[in-house]
Amino acid sequence: MRQRNIKNLDERLAANSAFLIDDPRACRGRWAEIFGNDNPIMLEIGCGKGKFITSRAAANPDVNYIAAEGQSSVVLRAMEKAQESQLCNLRIFIDFIHDLRDYFEEGELSGLYLNFSDPWPKARHAKRRL
């Protein structure tokens, strides 16, 4: 289903900005510093509204989680869930990941979640597929 436009999107993103990474490429090699600890780091590509990643972060406070999503209107829902649960081990960024090496150094991630990614079935969308 298509995501509807959200009123006051920019203001609501700013209100939850503690979880938002503005320039994730600049964080390459510095994720432990950003979290302030050396806990394992797990990445979810395509977090959607954040149900999975926020539940994982709440259940595992000794693991750091990063959620990536390309649509800001969807990310807002994940950020609001993180704010409600006061998750200090979760960071979120808005971007479509094409190459993990642009965001993470080798060995920086401990694991990766890829749940229900967009299928992009048309031939002209091949470049968007995982």
Which residue stretches match the model-derived regions?
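Conserved glycine-rich SAM-binding loop
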Residues: 48
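Short beta-strand element of Class I
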Residues: 63-66
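Conserved SAM/SAH-binding beta-strand->alpha-helix loop
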Residues: 71
